[in-house]
Amino acid sequence: MRGRTCPVLIFLLLLSAQSRADTGCVDLAQLAHSTVGITRYFDEADRNAQPGLVGIHGTAWFQSPTTIVTAAHVASGMKLSTQEWKSLKLEDGADSQSISVRIRRLAGGHAEKLAELELQTAVSNARSVAIRISPLAPEDRVVTFASPNQRLRAVAGRFVQYPDNGRLAGTALFEIYEGDNRLVIDHGASGAPVFDCEGRVAAVISTVITQTLATPFGEMRIPTPWGSPNVVSVPVQQLMEFSEAQ
């Protein structure tokens, strides 16, 4: 059995997930309209370049009614740019709307960055959320959003650590689960905010850590053991660090 970090949590519009959990750490009404599913359906030119792929789905949160934040690899996978406006579908529960977006900037000094996306039209019911400036402490409880079937659902977890060396240096590690399901954070959750118990964004989900078990029927993906981290995130404080546009 060996461990690996899944490099992309983007939902390729082909997959689904399952689950349900205790999120008593924070009043979920406080988080209403703060987080949206985002989908870009590719045009013919993009589909010709990637046959069989019709679009990309991820998650984002409102920094303001005209700005959303997601993981940089989500923006890259959607082929967004700083110059050209491209249409995204924003989904908030049963409500959805199409809005043109472009990259305002990429923030962070590590391999995975955060992407601020500018909306051409303001979202009237958007709830801008506060950013946590101070670092989390080990065992701090958190809440984030899973994206089974492209429908956001709150799930709970805890903060584990900020690695200071190796390939995960500069990230924030969490253990996120829903009941016995340690694979609840999966395809589509990239870009989801991780909230502390005061409803402030502390990090943004980037990747998931899993293990691979060899079986007579092929390799099977299984979760990491209980008590160990299973989600890699980008600390939100990177929004205040070096940024670039590209």
Can you annotate each of these PLM segments?
Residues 1-7:
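Bacterial N-terminal signal peptides that target proteins for export
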Residues 16-18:
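N-terminal signal peptide c-region/cleavage motif recognized by signal peptidases
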Residues 22-27, 61, 77-80, 102-107, ...:
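Active-site substrate-binding loop(s) of clan PA
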Residues 24-25, 45-71, 191-192:
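A conserved glycine-rich beta-strand in the N-terminal activation segment of trypsin-fold
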Residues 31-52, 118-127, 151-245:
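Active-site region of chymotrypsin-like
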Residues 32-34, 56-58, 64, 84, ...:
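Envelope-exposed proteins and targeting segments
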Residues 57, 63-112, 207-212, 216-219:
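Catalytic-histidine neighborhood of serine endopeptidases
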